[in-house]
Amino acid sequence: MRSTGRRRRRPPERRRVAVKDPQTIHLAHSPDADDAFMFWALAAGRIDTGDRRYVHELGDIESLNRRALAGELEVTAVSLHAYAYLADRYALLAHGASIGDRYGPRIVARAARPADPRAALGAGSLLVAVPGELTTAFLALKLYQPAARHVVVPFDQIEEYVVAGHADAGLLIHEGQLTYADRGLHLWVDLGEWWHDETGLPLPLGGNVVRRDLGDALMRDIARDLKASIQYGLAHRAEALAHATAYGRGLDPSRIDRFVGMYVNAYTVDYGPTGRQAVAELLARAQRAGLLPGPVQVTFVAG
């Protein structure tokens, strides 16, 4: 066969497009209806997170506080009390706060409310079941009555612990704030209401922190993702509530709706000036009362 002298053309080479490996970020929060609501869009892939992939971990807040102290988690929910011991390693995300505006952790008891609950709790004869010594609820209790005696009990067992007579009173967080009367317990003090009477400010209870070694750019990206998740949940409330119901620990839908409404609010989208002032005031008062080792420099990262 004779050659035509023509060279066969090579097919054009396909350009290889570099695909950035997804960055895996471990994000931890408590298995509660309010956290489930705010993280739903992120967990369900409803928002664009670019090359960031989130792995969700669940744990009770005291366990998360302890893990954050060890630096184990890149992003996690923590108590604002615990943040006082984390500020050198973690920054506080400006989004995802649990802030009670004239309501918060509640001190309940089998006995009816005395004329002076503060004096009764400080007399030394009563034992209060608390959900953890790093919780903000515990810090608020100690600001209210430093002499209160306490025993640490898992947060979801406190009501039963008090009903059974193992403690005289219980410090309730999460959904227990709505269910104590079902067990015949009596409200002695709402610490969020007390705090507002004292300061005129809401009570900041929990927030989300990000480890500083991730770098400024990634911390801001994470903050944007979290803010977008909260805003998406608020814009699609019915769907987010349906997801949160699975974490309601037996609460009926109306109570889940009420609880989420209490702790997923405007402060959750962003602390804002009032929320930031409340954090500073809480930590400053705790430091002056000798409940913290020293002043706390709070760094907020916003998206």
Features from the language model and the residues they span:
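Bilobed "Venus flytrap"/periplasmic-binding protein-like clamshell domains
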Residues: 22-44, 58, 105-169, 175, ...
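Secondary-structure end/capping motifs
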Residues: 215-285
